Amino acid sequence: MLEKLKKLLSKKGDNFSTPAPVSVDDYLEEIEEIPLTPVEEEKVIIKVCSIEDEKDAVNAIVMAEAGYIVIAKTPNLEKEIDDEFIEIIRKMRNEVAKFGGMLLALGDEHLLITPRNVVIEKLIKEKKEESNVTKENIEIKEEKEENSE
């Protein structure tokens, strides 16, 4: 990786090819639209708290069971937790599952606790066929390689 950066930044890196210019129309064709249907219902309230002990965990669970989405700051889940805190998270997971909610880790320092009426879905992008711009760039690159041989 370091060698590639050195080549790229050195004056000898003239052999790198630049992509062909892209027209605005071609660029706009490449943009993927994610199909979403807007949902207009009552306001969603998100509660933010910190979990340092079992009492804080119980409060967060009660808020989620009452219908709030809870984002809870925790000690660093990679570096700073001990067996006691792991047991607290295990109890939280079991209690949240009892009322049909979800408990998810958001990075190393946050938990997301949802009530039963909240569904979390992973966004899956559909693969589009290679765009015309990509095809053109490949063709130009192949032509340059043929000409250089």
UniProtKB/Swiss-Prot annotation:
Biased composition (Basic and acidic residues): 130-144
A Pfam cross-reference name: SepF
Start and end residues of each stretch annotated as Disordered: 130-149
Listed name of the protein: Uncharacterized protein MJ0919
Source species of the chain: Methanocaldococcus jannaschii (strain ATCC 43067 / DSM 2661 / JAL-1 / JCM 10045 / NBRC 100440)
